[in-house]
């Protein structure tokens, strides 16, 4: 029973933030016009700071073998999701273009905004760096296999050079040459503050989108 309560306690804050986002949208406080700019800000600034903060600040060791396993696991899990969704789309006899969009949307699970706070609350924040590395594999799959599914003629490897992926690679390099000790305190504080905003704002935006559907 205590485990069940622990899980409920861990899930409650993200769900509450979703609810707040939905209520703000319904009340006109979180307007649709703000979604695009806030989404870009979250993905290109807040999320990378979140990754950098937890990877560089992580006190444990990141063994290269485990690093590779986590990346491969993230990549394979999304590819399996795409495959299953494609199979379902074919069984439903969806149009080819619709099937591709369906498989892309259905094959991607919530690997970030909901996963981080729940996993951190249940297993401790020491798990978050591992989820970030896992997400590197997910991002690679989304920007390669996923983009190819949606539009094979627009598939470009340069799409892999985006802020979240770059921040992970940069964080790993900083860890190797000294870690947090080589980052000036004021810079570290800025990264910490920006990173702390990533999950709440992301969940508020998702909640706002849910509010549009109700």
Regions found by a protein language model. Give the residues of each.
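Alpha-helical transmembrane segments of multi-pass small-molecule/ion transporters
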Residues: 1-214
